[in-house]
Swiss-Prot record:
This is Dephospho-CoA kinase. It is found in: Cytoplasm. GO terms for cellular component: cytoplasm. Residues 3-204 form the DPCK domain.
Length: 205
């Protein structure tokens, strides 16, 4: 098994890269998706979030009001740290369960937005960083996700710097390119990952 940490700044295109890797045959463990699952209605995770931030972060149907919570935590580093302390251990436990279920020769992609921020690089055999210029990130967040420029800049500022992400990268995937070129680059990276997965001693398993 080859454990790959995949990360990138918000708006860099990490989700597109993970989708393409899955098409090639990777096993994906998506931290964002798991983070939503562990705070679903009725979970201990959601109860802990409500205890920390109050019932104002709940939608009328009892689910987590993500935009409301986001507006609180991305404007206050201390509150973001509180949220991360609740969610990250739950995500880690579920991720380990999914990894254990994967085949012995699998390339397991851990899609982890905050890999650099939380010093998680040593957990993986190698780290792939999807990189885009800050201008590209901002454009995608405003144009494609409908964020205000202020909200987009706040979310970018809440993450690790571009330099910090690049410093932990074993492979950097430049995504200031059209989709067709990105698809070609992902194909090349996939071939490299499969080769590494079959090298004796490469995996931490």
């Amino acid at each position: 098994m080859l454990k790959v940490g995949l990360t990138g700044g918000i708006g860099a295109g990490k989700s597109e890269v993970s989708r393409l890797l899955v098409e090639h045959g990777a096993v994906l463990i998506d931290a964002d998706r798991i983070a939503r699952e562990v705070v679903a209605p009725g979970t201990p995770g959601l109860a802990a979030v409500v205890e920390a931030f109050g019932t104002d972060v709940l939608a009328p149907d009892g689910s987590l009001d993500r935009p409301k919570l986001g507006s609180i935590v991305f404007a206050d580093p201390d509150k973001l740290a509180v949220l991360n302390a609740i969610v990250h251990p739950l995500v880690g436990a579920r991720s380990r369960e999914l990894e254990t279920a994967a085949a012995a020769d699998a390339v397991v992609i851990h899609d982890v937005p905050l890999l650099a921020e939380n010093g998680l690089a040593p957990l993986y055999d190698l780290v792939v960083v999807v990189d885009a210029s800050p201008e590209t990130q901002l454009d995608r967040l405003v144009r494609l996700r409908g964020m205000t420029e202020q909200d987009a800049r706040a979310r970018m500022a809440a993450q690790a710097t571009r330099e910090k992400r690049l410093a932990i990268a074993d492979i950097v995937m430049d995504n200031d390119v059209p989709l067709e070129e990105l698809e070609r680059r992902v194909g090349d990276v996939w071939a490299d990952l499969v080769h590494r997965a079959h090298q004796p001693g490469e995996s931490q398993e």
